[in-house]
């Protein structure tokens, strides 16, 4: 259960497929019955890769992401983490300081079980995952009737609801005047829920939800449902 601490993140309770979840404004899901945090598309190392190629991008994204995960662990008292693919970005070698940072963080949370459902960017990085003492599995991973995947289209047994990543979903919301603001979102239909990308330097993909989809936008440290006219406008936009 959430701990009452200063700066506690707000959350939106959500039920689907007979399970209760909490959608969090840091783009993760807390699963109380499993004491688990679900997150997708961290893409650790992407900014460092760009900097190595001479592209000026901000430093410190790894620190920011690790702190967000740590805060969520402390606030939810979770005992396990499930990464829904693309834990790291595709690059052939790691800088020492980058690996050291991840290993130091992992050491601080040795009591947390960490499982990675392999994504397309995780191929060839098993040495790092072994160092991080992560359980690495192919999709889908079935946990209490939920199929944990990287790709939303992954085939699962009939009747299994999927939670997935890969898409980096976002929606455009009208701001002041004619301006549009692109913000990340969770999106659910009858068979799959897709998480927004957790990474600080990942980009997003604008979706066009169906009227029957449930869309939950993430902005200003809040998670809020887009329903009614707002949902229809998104579908038509």
Per-segment meaning from a language model:
Residues 1-84, 89-237:
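Extended recognition/assembly regions associated with phosphoester-bond processing machinery
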């Amino acid at each position: 259960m959430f701990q009452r601490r200063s700066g506690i993140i707000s959350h939106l309770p959500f039920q689907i497929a007979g399970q209760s979840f909490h959608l969090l404004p840091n783009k993760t899901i807390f699963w109380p019955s499993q004491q688990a945090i679900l997150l997708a598309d961290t893409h650790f190392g992407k900014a460092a890769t760009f900097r190595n190629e001479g592209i000026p991008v901000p430093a410190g994204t790894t620190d920011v992401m690790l702190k967000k995960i740590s805060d969520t662990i402390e606030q939810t008292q979770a005992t396990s983490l499930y990464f829904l693919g693309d834990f790291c970005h595709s690059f052939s070698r790691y800088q020492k300081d980058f690996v050291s940072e991840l290993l130091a963080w992992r050491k601080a949370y040795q009591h947390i079980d960490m499982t990675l459902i392999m994504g397309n960017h995780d191929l060839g990085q098993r040495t790092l995952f072994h160092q991080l003492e992560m359980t690495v599995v192919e999709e889908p991973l079935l946990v209490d009737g939920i199929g944990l995947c990287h790709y939303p289209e992954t085939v699962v047994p009939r009747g299994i609801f999927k939670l997935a990543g890969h898409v980096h979903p976002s929606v455009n919301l009208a701001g002041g005047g004619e301006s549009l603001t692109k913000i990340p979102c969770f999106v659910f239909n009858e068979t799959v829920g897709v998480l927004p990308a957790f990474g600080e330097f990942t980009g997003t993909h604008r979706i066009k939800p169906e009227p029957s989809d449930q869309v939950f936008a993430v902005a200003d440290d809040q998670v809020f449902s887009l329903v009614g006219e707002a949902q229809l406008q998104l579908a038509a936009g």
